[in-house]
From Swiss-Prot:
Annotated source species: Natronomonas pharaonis (strain ATCC 35678 / DSM 2160 / CIP 103997 / JCM 8858 / NBRC 14720 / NCIMB 2260 / Gabara) (Halobacterium pharaonis)
Modified residues (N6-(pyridoxal phosphate)lysine): K205
Gene Ontology annotations of biological process type: carboxylic acid metabolic process; coenzyme A biosynthetic process
Protein name: Probable L-aspartate decarboxylase
Enzyme class: lyase
The protein's required cofactors: pyridoxal 5'-phosphate
E.C. designation(s): 4.1.1.11
Annotated gene: mfnA
Main function: Catalyzes the decarboxylation of L-aspartate to produce beta-alanine.
Amino acid sequence: MQRAEPQEFSRVLSSMCTEPHPAAREAAERFLATNPGDPGTYETVSKLEREAVDMLGEVAGLPDAAGYIASGGTEANIQAVRIARNRADTRTPNFVAPASAHFSFRKAADILGVELRTAPLEDYRANLDGVAELIDSDTALVVGVAGTTEYGRVDPIPALADMAADAGALCHVDAAWGGFVLPFTEHAWDFDDADIHTMTIDPHKMGQAAVPAGGLLARGPELLDELAIDTPYLESTSQVTLTGTRSGAGVASAAAVMDELWRDGYRQQYETAQTNAHWLAAEVESRGFDVVDPVLPIVAMDLPYDLVADLRERGWRLSRTEADEARIVCMPHVTRSMLEEFLTDLDRLA
């Protein structure tokens, strides 16, 4: 059988995952054979999961956080909608999310039979008037995004939380990517800033954990109780997670890397990434291309379709926004020298 080699990150510019930190790699290898879905049997990894959730709570301004390490942001977003649906006192629940929300919310609506109402944007953020027009007595959840996938924008989270409260709905924040950069900014986004109920925050993105290591946080355990089912043949009696068997490697890597990097390591990582994003935006703009201001370390640029195709032929992994801009995410593996090499190819091909 031919031996397959993992893809190098040397030309990966659009991914929101990155090379795991050495501490994450080592921990993941040690816990490959463990299953936090059976905490009675795998007690050590269960304790590590509790530590990981506690640290995620510290990152997101939530002491004594409830939650668990999920497969990724999609699972966490689905679970947040599921909590809201199960808690709602209506037979026809809906939830409101901005047009910038991740496509996983469309999956959630389809799987759970909950109507998704999509609010318009203003300067790439949720338009509050548009959200208000969509909320009614059947609204179970209002979603805000803290670090949008395409542009890195942060919705007005406190205002969205207030609107949810007025409607008797829950408020969920999707900070899958932004959660490990926003603590070092002035944005209001977390449990300490607003009366939000649940949050998606992924260690395997800017947290540098090994995949799979997403995160779901809840303000209290009673919210997770909405997800509980009996597990009669396990040593534990109930389960709130979406999947049964889960990756102990992901859990261990998340706990290890957060212990290693929070807080100063992540601060330095953010400052480097943000500096690189601003530098890249200025360089691309100086070449005559329109660029969306990188509020967080994501650069969207109006490169012609054929030029992006040529860059991809040279091995650069670039994605495009819905508006057809090229998009670069300044992840920890995206160095200044890597960006300089990208610009060299851009100049040759433009």
